[in-house]
């Protein structure tokens, strides 16, 4: 099997081990195909190499249904890391907590949005007034305003188009920040930066596991996480987008 090797000399402890645990956990779901882990050590990981082809509508439709199956495999709790892994997980190069919580809102606000806000402010990418708006949105989320009866889903956690590879055998996922969360968060991240045949993906997902009414209105709520991550290190345009998403979240109630 041909392999793709990633190395990072300054990788924090557990950086690649967390990725490997996430890949294996997602693969166990039997939904979307995930790149297989071949080898892993403290400063490197080797995964199967995926020969990419042009995205196709048939593959997109299959991806939507398979993603629903992956989410349905579930997790022990909101915020739960893959079994066998303890400690922080990583999104890109940034660490984020993975502490199990009973409710989605308490987890999402405290572990997926709030940790990145002061970093964004210090970087000059988010104003103090903008941080106040985000803080109010997080308070609303933490109080349970958007909690529902959805069980914890098995999330990829960094589901943007760059981590969705199109092969001759269908979509293959790489580079997860896997954890237990709300399934709408994966879908919102997929929409944030665009993905080929997104509407077809969403359609077959919804057919396989119908989404709750109003899910499109909640996209900004579920984009708070990736926008906060990007505001922390990718410029003030993401800070402005984060504030806009926070304002839309506040307007939901």
Where are these regions (language model features)?
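Regulatory N- and C-terminal appendages and interdomain linkers associated
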Residues: 11-17, 42-45, 79, 128, ...
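Active-site Asp-x-Gly
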Residues: 97-109, 118, 148-154, 161-217, ...
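ATP-binding pocket architecture of kinase catalytic cores
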Residues: 2-106
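Hydrophobic alpha-helical segments that form the core
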Residues: 220-228
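Conserved Rossmann-like nucleotide-binding pocket used by diverse enzymes
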Residues: 5, 155, 220
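Short strand-connecting beta-turns/loops that link adjacent beta-strands
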Residues: 42, 167-170, 224
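An alpha-helical support segment within catalytic cores of ATP-dependent transferases
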Residues: 75-154
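A general structural signal marking secondary-structure boundaries and capping sites
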Residues: 27-30, 71-78, 120, 145, ...
């Amino acid at each position: 099997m041909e392999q793709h090797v990633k190395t990072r000399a300054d990788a924090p402890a557990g950086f690649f081990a967390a990725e490997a645990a996430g890949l294996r956990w997602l693969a166990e779901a039997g939904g979307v195909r995930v790149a297989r882990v071949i080898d892993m050590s403290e400063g490197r990981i080797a995964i199967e190499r995926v020969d990419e082809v042009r995205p196709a509508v048939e593959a997109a439709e299959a991806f939507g249904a398979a993603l629903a199956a992956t989410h349905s495999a579930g997790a022990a709790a909101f915020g739960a890391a893959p079994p066998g892994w303890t400690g922080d997980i990583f999104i890109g190069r940034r660490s984020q907590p993975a502490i199990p919580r009973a409710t989605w809102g308490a987890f999402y606000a405290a572990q997926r949005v709030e940790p990145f806000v002061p970093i964004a402010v210090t970087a000059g990418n988010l104003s103090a007034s903008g941080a106040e708006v985000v803080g109010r949105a997080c308070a609303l989320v933490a109080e349970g305003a958007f909690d529902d009866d959805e069980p914890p889903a098995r999330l990829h956690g960094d589901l943007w188009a760059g981590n969705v590879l199109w092969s001759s055998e269908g979509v293959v996922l790489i580079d997860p920040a896997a954890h237990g969360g709300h399934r709408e968060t994966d879908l919102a991240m997929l929409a944030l930066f665009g993905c080929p045949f997104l509407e077809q993906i969403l359609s077959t997902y919804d057919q396989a596991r119908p989404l709750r009414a109003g899910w499109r209105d909640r996209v900004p709520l579920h984009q708070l996480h990736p926008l906060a991550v990007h505001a922390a290190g990718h410029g003030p345009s993401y800070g402005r987008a984060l504030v806009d998403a926070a304002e839309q979240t506040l307007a939901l109630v």
